[in-house]
Amino acid sequence: VVGLVIGGYFAWYVYTAMYQPNIWTANGKPISFYVYPNESYASVETKLYQKGLIINRKKFEWLSEKMKYPENVKVGHYRIPNGMNNNDLINMLRSGSQAPVNVIFNNTRTIEDFAVRISEQLLLDTASLLKVLSNSAFLEPMGFTPDNVKIMFIPNTYEFYWTVSAEAFVKRMNHEYKRFWTDDKKQLA
């Protein structure tokens, strides 16, 4: 009988550690949470606690260890909803299941201003983006040069993963440029 009680308690503990809602957000809405390069599990854990997101720290820490999250911290931008359970949170963070960010740009006068504006919204830095935007060999197959590359960027709101590379960002913007400037639009212009 004692064994059944102990076994039942353990099963209840595991179940609640995994599936009981353990995330609380102040306004009840999802929050953005960023994990930076070279950030440790301890740092991620501290940020979650400082934001007041984790209701039961012991169960979060126990399950994190069991699911090997400390060895699998992934960089990214995550959307954490109110009422999420530990299992879903840890799976999202350790698998790198990012939520896209909205990247908005308009009224940038120079390519340098543009690169600064983009690096304020994504993980990539201004220097790496400027390096790609000045690389003739990279731009030429797309039909651009460092002198005319600014016309590729059509002001709008775009969704990107926060960790996108400078090269992937420019390739995506080239795709958006081609999608916008159809043959019909080119003839009208």
Per-segment meaning from a language model:
Residues 1-189:
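Conserved catalytic or metal-liganding residues and their short signature motifs at active sites
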